[in-house]
Amino acid sequence: MTALGALIKRDIRIALRVGGGALIGVLFFLTVVVLMPFALGPDLALLARLGPAILWLGALLASLLTLDRLFMADHEDGSLDLIVMGRMPLELACAAKALAHWLAAGLPLIVATPVLGLLLNLDTVSTSAVALTLLAGTPALTFTGMIGAALAVTLHRGGLLLAVLVLPLSIPVLIFGVAASQAAIAGPSSFGAPFSILCALSLVSFVIGPFAAAASLRHGLD
């Protein structure tokens, strides 16, 4: 197994164990979606209209909740220093850690979306559209959030700084994710533009995120 594959497998295994963060994100996502019908009342039409936004907001907050452990656990046990000084390019290591985080914490949210959509009175087409937009957009949340996680890892009260840094960068993803979901529900003809922008945001974050995170780690750990 290559060093890259070993790093991804290790991070997934750590995230999936008790206290690793992946389960916390899924439970938080479930809690947000389950509580919303009680807060909005028995209006099923209102639930269906707000359903995509609720699912996207829950996914955003759940992702933010687990991002603080992206580098923190490695920093606490000293393995982050080994990663920084290792032979593998740090940018590639950051990309591998972000991919492992998305597989462990982001992908389960997408899998749970069709079931949770039933609680929001969404039909099969609507839940499928939301799941597709989450599949395209949640990588942007992870790779953008990785930059904030790298900046916060060496700072006191880094979790608060992480929220301040990541939330503004996540707003475009949230806007176009909800817009694409609503467009797919309204009619497929208007789905292409916001969905294409959402995919572009993920691709841009995939390119920029590892380099920005690696630079932050090098500067913070010097």
Describe the predicted segments one by one:
Residues 64-84:
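Transmembrane helix boundary and interhelical loop/hinge segments in multi-pass membrane proteins
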Residues 128, 133-167, 218-222:
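A structural motif at transmembrane helix-loop-helix junctions in multipass membrane proteins
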Residues 205-222:
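Junction motif at the cytosolic side of a transmembrane helix
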Residues 1-25:
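Aromatic- and glycine-rich beta-strand/loop motifs that create alpha-glucan
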Residues 51-67, 71:
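Long, hydrophobic alpha-helical segments
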Residues 39-50, 114-135, 181-195, 220:
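Membrane-interfacial helix-loop-helix connectors in multipass membrane proteins
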Residues 19-41, 56-59, 165-176, 202-209:
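Hydrophobic alpha-helical transmembrane segments of multi-pass membrane transport/permease proteins
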Residues 95-120, 140, 144, 177-178:
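Hydrophobic alpha-helical transmembrane segments that constitute the membrane-spanning cores
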